[in-house]
Structure formats: structure tokens, C-alpha cells
């Protein structure tokens, strides 16, 4: 998931020397400078999910993978699966104001409306939600 992308594109107007009737240093400095280039650097940061500590009454939940097949064996398209209103997942870490019933390792059911999904740079999907937004503990 973590990737590095670097792209350099030269400006085509400065690729060839410009002939001027009078010698000008401006034309020569633009040929060798990087002002005529576009440089993009996108670096994704990777965090260890167990080391991320939520604040106050928030919990960090690792989402379970959505089903690819229905119970009857029919393949489900992603468009049909992504609009599920209720999600289940495993609690990874909890904030300091969370009660004793909710702790790391427990499975919970919650609504996707109240969850804030984050990308921690791993293959798994994670989200933050409040303890009061948890609907049920799943045994």
C-alpha cells in the first residue's frame, strides 16, 4: 500500500535553445534550471495499527472484509456490498475515556454512518468511532 511516486516533466518550450538577436543570459539560465520542470513527490506513510492510540472516547476498529459471495453462491459486485449500513470489526485500541466493557480484541457491530475510515498504510481497513456509537459486542 505504501508507495513512492516521483515524476519529472520538462517544459517543452525551454527544451530547445532560443535564438535571440542580442545575447541574453535569461535564455541560458532557463535551459539549465529546474524552473521549467514539474516535480511530484507522493510518499505514503505507514503506521502500525496497534501503536495508534485514539483520544477520549474513541476506539480504533479493524473492519472485517466484506463478503465476495452471498450465502447462495452468487458473486456480489462491490457496488452492492459497499452500501451496507452496519459493519463488524475487531477493536485494536481504545481511548482513555472508554469503559471497561470495551477493550482490544473484542468484536463489535457499529454503523458506517458514525465511523470515520482511515488509511494506516496496511492492507486492512481501519476506522475510528465513538464508544457511544457502538451498537453491540459480538461474542
Swiss-Prot record:
GO cellular component, as recorded? chloroplast; chloroplast envelope; chloroplast stroma; cytosol
Main location group:
plastid
UniProt keywords, alphabetically: Chaperone, Chloroplast, Plastid, Transit peptide
Any idea where this protein resides? Plastid, Chloroplast stroma
Which CDD domains does this UniProt record tie to the protein?
A: cpn10
Renumbered residue ranges of the record's region Cpn-10 domain: 51-138
SUPFAM superfamilies per the record?
GroES-like
A GO BP annotation: protein folding
Molecular function terms in GO for this entry? ATP binding; protein domain specific binding; protein folding chaperone
- Please name the InterPro entries in this protein's record: Chaperonin_GroES, Chaperonin_GroES_sf, GroES-like_sf
Expression (tissue specificity)? Expressed in leaves and stems. Expressed at low levels in germinating seeds, seedlings, rosettes leaves, flowers and siliques.
Q: Where is the transit peptide?
A: 1-39
The entry sums up its family as follows: Belongs to the GroES chaperonin family.
Briefly, what is this protein's role? Answer: Functions as a co-chaperone for protein folding in chloroplasts.
- Name of the featured protein: 10 kDa chaperonin 2, chloroplastic
State the organism of origin.
Arabidopsis thaliana (Mouse-ear cress)
UniProt lineage:
Eukaryota, Viridiplantae, Streptophyta, Embryophyta, Tracheophyta
Amino acid at each position: 500500500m505504501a508507495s513512492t511516486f516521483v515524476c519529472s516533466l520538462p517544459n517543452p518550450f525551454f527544451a530547445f535553445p532560443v535564438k535571440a538577436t542580442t545575447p541574453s543570459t535569461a535564455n541560458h539560465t532557463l535551459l539549465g534550471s529546474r524552473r521549467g520542470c514539474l516535480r511530484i513527490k507522493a510518499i505514503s506513510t505507514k503506521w502500525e495499527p496497534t501503536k495508534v492510540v485514539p483520544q477520549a472516547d474513541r476506539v480504533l476498529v479493524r473492519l472485517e472484509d466484506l463478503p465476495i459471495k452471498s450465502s447462495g453462491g452468487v458473486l456480489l459486485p462491490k457496488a452492492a456490498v459497499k452500501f451496507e449500513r452496519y459493519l463488524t470489526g475487531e477493536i485494536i485500541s481504545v481511548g482513555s475515556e472508554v469503559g471497561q466493557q470495551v477493550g482490544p480484541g473484542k468484536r463489535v457491530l457499529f454503523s458506517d454512518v458514525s465511523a470515520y475510515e482511515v488509511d494506516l498504510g496496511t492492507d486492512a481497513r481501519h476506522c475510528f468511532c465513538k464508544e457511544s456509537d457502538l451498537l453491540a459486542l459480538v461474542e
